[in-house]
A protein has these predicted regions:
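Membrane-embedded beta-strand positions of outer-membrane beta-barrel proteins
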Residues: 6-8, 33, 42-44, 87, ...
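Outer-membrane beta-barrel "beta-signal"
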Residues: 85, 140-144, 171-186
């Protein structure tokens, strides 16, 4: 079995009201294409922030659905462009239903705060706006979803993340254990 995968996301944000923090007019888009063949899925994605400010959203809320918004990096800095490649492996065809693996790599470049609103402005030690900022992130994940019993659909993930960036950004390494248990409320 072969299936094509694709998606497109677009957001536009504008300020309203008294504009006490200055003006804000921004848009960002992302797109991905991929192919699924048997147990394997390969995807590539592109993303671009066309605005002069970070594309703002409620942090830690999963309220932004952009293809390159991944574990740590959102690749949403002013004028930033980014790409991603992702590979998923479903172990069910190999006799282990519920087990899957994922790895992805994303890279961003050209982040430029030269025209950013003062609220979003990021500067170097000399007070100059940051320009030509770059970063990358790599995620590796193993996931298991319980197949039967009272814990059916409960999932356990172990994900290792590494991100590196130019000056004034974070270089991080972390491991997360993510446990999800779906509840039906109604």
């Amino acid at each position: 079995d072969v299936a094509l995968i694709g998606g497109l996301n677009y957001y536009k944000a504008v300020d309203e009201g008294k504009q006490l923090l200055g003006s804000f007019d921004n848009n960002i888009w992302s797109g991905k294409v991929g192919i699924q063949f048997g147990a394997h899925t390969v995807q590539v994605g592109l993303q671009r922030n066309n605005g002069d400010d970070d594309f703002d959203y409620l942090r830690q809320s999963d309220s932004i659905y952009l293809d390159n918004s991944i574990q740590y990096s959102d690749f949403n800095s002013p004028k930033e462009k980014s790409w991603q490649v992702r590979y998923d492996l479903d172990m069910e065809p190999f006799g282990v239903p519920g087990l899957s693996f994922m790895t992805r790599y994303a890279q961003g470049w050209d982040a430029d705060y030269s025209n950013a609103n003062e609220v979003y402005m990021r500067r170097d030690d000399n007070g100059d706006p940051l320009t030509n900022q770059k970063r990358w992130e790599r995620d590796i994940e193993a996931k298991y979803v319980v197949q039967t019993g009272s814990l059916k659909d409960m999932s356990f993930r172990v994900r290792q993340m590494t991100t590196r960036a130019t000056d004034y950004e974070s270089d991080l390494d972390e491991v997360r254990l993510i446990v999800e248990y779906p509840l039906e409320v109604l």
